[in-house]
Curated annotation (Swiss-Prot):
Pfam families: Cytochrom_B_C, Cytochrome_B. The lineage of its organism: Eukaryota, Metazoa, Chordata, Craniata, Vertebrata. Binds 2 heme b groups non-covalently. This is Cytochrome b. Gene3D superfamilies: Cytochrome Bc1 Complex, Chain C. Component of the ubiquinol-cytochrome c reductase complex (complex III or cytochrome b-c1 complex) that is part of the mitochondrial respiratory chain. The b-c1 complex mediates electron transfer from ubiquinol to cytochrome c. Contributes to the generation of a proton gradient across the mitochondrial membrane that is then used for ATP synthesis. The cytochrome bc1 complex contains 11 subunits: 3 respiratory subunits (MT-CYB, CYC1 and UQCRFS1), 2 core proteins (UQCRC1 and UQCRC2) and 6 low-molecular weight proteins (UQCRH/QCR6, UQCRB/QCR7, UQCRQ/QCR8, UQCR10/QCR9, UQCR11/QCR10 and a cleavage product of UQCRFS1). This cytochrome bc1 complex then forms a dimer. It is found in: Mitochondrion inner membrane. SUPFAM superfamilies: a domain/subunit of cytochrome bc1 complex (Ubiquinol-cytochrome c reductase) (SSF81648), Transmembrane di-heme cytochromes (SSF81342). The chain crosses the membrane at residues 34-54, 78-99, 114-134, 179-199, 227-247, 289-309, 321-341, 348-368. It comes from the Eukaryota. Belongs to the cytochrome b family. PROSITE patterns: CYTB_CTER (PS51003), CYTB_NTER (PS51002).
Length: 379
């Protein structure tokens, strides 16, 4: 019998074992679609970003105008920009749901896959931050100023570090130039780390909703999950295109329609919606260094999750107490997101502090405690 090129060709056999003949659990639900959705988000962002970069000028006197020019004079430039800006929002929606899925079903017990995933999240956050600065509107400029300034809270080296990052004594042309360079580079780094993420995942195979070993009941990825993923792509692109066509500025800040002006501070400096939860945690501590540490901890805490798993069951499917806690955490994050968008005044300050405290309490104390309690109740 002639050898199948799909299985014998040095390159094709890698693709085959990753995307075609990959043995997959037969019972994975739609929550397992977000990995491929993140992949398609990344590809979309790189393609639209590349097209935008062809018309963008990384100079403080020209950046704002070059973006306006892209939207007004370039064929479908408005669409490319709207897809890129709103594509970032969908990227974050997908990654947050993907992390939530991993948390709920105990996928974090694949430690290498989980840790590379957290690194991917951090890189994505860095990419989105530097990208938001590029249009050089008011919120771009002041967002860059406020967030980079946080590094000055680091003892001893802080101020030097910030001036080194800025390339001067304030956010200016050198800052914009390097942010553009970083925004161009980081997505390719994300693509590289994604391959590592997938390599680690394919070492163990996918987890499943029951959290049990599924070797005895695997099915090929293609056609079952390739088709299911294609449906997922369609279901994501429909709202993305709807947003890009009908309400492209819904998630943006009106302040960014004003060119950057170092002499005028906007009344409310706030990041894009996907960073608001972390911004609320940052603001909840009335001390610069403390706030920066809490901000870092709010994301880095994900590295600790595998060590805080005390339950004898992997998934939360059959753990009602942990489920209640999980949805409390989700509600808590929504409250933090809302607080991050509000001005720093009563009652938002105290609500933010309570939500920030309960965020860390739920993750560090209650989850392991409830996991241990459920063991006592069940076994």
């Amino acid at each position: 019998m002639a050898p199948n090129i799909r299985k014998s060709h040095p390159l094709l056999k890698i693709i085959n074992s990753s995307l075609i003949d990959l043995p997959s659990p037969s019972n994975i639900s739609a929550w397992w679609n977000f990995g491929s959705l993140l992949g398609i988000c990344l590809i979309t962002q790189i393609l639209t970003g590349l097209l935008l970069a062809m018309h963008y000028t990384a100079d403080t006197s020209l950046a704002f105008s070059s973006v306006a020019h892209t939207c007004r004079n370039v064929q479908y430039g408005w669409l490319i920009r709207n897809l890129h800006a709103n594509g970032a929002s969908f990227f974050f929606i997908c990654i947050y749901l993907h992390i939530g899925r991993g948390f709920y079903y105990g996928s974090y017990l694949y430690k290498e896959t989980w840790n590379t995933g957290v690194v991917l999240l951090l890189t994505l956050m860095a990419t989105a931050f530097v990208g938001y600065v590029l249009p050089w509107g008011q919120m771009s400029f002041w967002g860059a100023t406020v967030i980079t300034n946080l590094f000055s809270a680091i003892p001893y080296i802080g101020q030097t570090l910030v001036e080194w990052a800025w390339g001067g004594f304030s956010v200016d042309n050198p800052t914009l130039t390097r942010f553009f360079a970083l925004h161009f580079l980081l997505p390719f780094l994300i693509a590289g780390i994604t391959l590592i993420h997938l390599t680690f995942l394919h070492e163990t195979g996918s987890n499943n909703p029951l959290g049990i070993v599924s070797h005895s009941d695997k099915i090929p990825f293609h056609p079952y999950f390739s088709l299911k993923d294609a449906l997922g792509f369609a279901l994501m692109f429909i709202p993305l295109l709807t947003l890009a066509f009908f309400s492209p500025n819904l998630l943006g800040d009106p302040e960014n329609f004003t060119p950057a002006n170092p002499l005028v501070t906007p009344p409310h400096i706030k990041p894009e919606w996907y960073f608001l939860f972390a911004y609320a945690i940052l603001r909840s501590i009335p001390n610069k260094l403390g706030g920066v540490l809490a901000l870092a901890a709010s994301v880095l805490i994900l590295f600790l999750i595998p060590f805080l798993h005390k339950s004898k069951q992997r998934s939360m499917t059959f753990r009602p107490l942990s489920q209640i806690l999980f949805w409390l955490l989700v509600a808590n994050l929504l409250i933090l997101t809302w607080i991050g968008s509000q001005p720093v005044e009563h009652p938002f300050i105290i609500i933010g502090q309570m939500a920030s405290f309960s965020y860390f309490l739920i993750l560090l104390v209650l989850f392991p405690a409830i996991g241990a309690l459920e063991n006592k109740m069940l076994y």
